[in-house]
Amino acid sequence: MYKPLPDSLIIQSSGINGQGLFAKQNIPAQENLGITHIKLGEKIIRTPLGGFINHSDNPNCTKSHTFVTNHNDSKIKYDYKQWNLFTIKNIKKGEELTLEYTFYKI
């Protein structure tokens, strides 16, 4: 079953800008929270996880990208790049998750 956000997160009003992602429970450092963006060819798809995280110069999350390919299957060949959101600090229940915006510097 598709879930736009992990069970540990909720979207709420943010003091930073509009709405943001907040922890519903304590989240440990180095936790993979899921996919924020996928790049297929020249198209970039942003997930709800990527759409609601706000910028901070002192973030508690980072993103990591992976290149995914399936050139071994002669019937369906694909490749894409995906970005996942990881916590870099322990995050307390109620704390907003933030990221240093560098996505468009790619």
Can you annotate each of these PLM segments?
Residues 1-106:
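Conserved catalytic SET/PR domain of SAM-dependent protein methyltransferases, capturing the structural core
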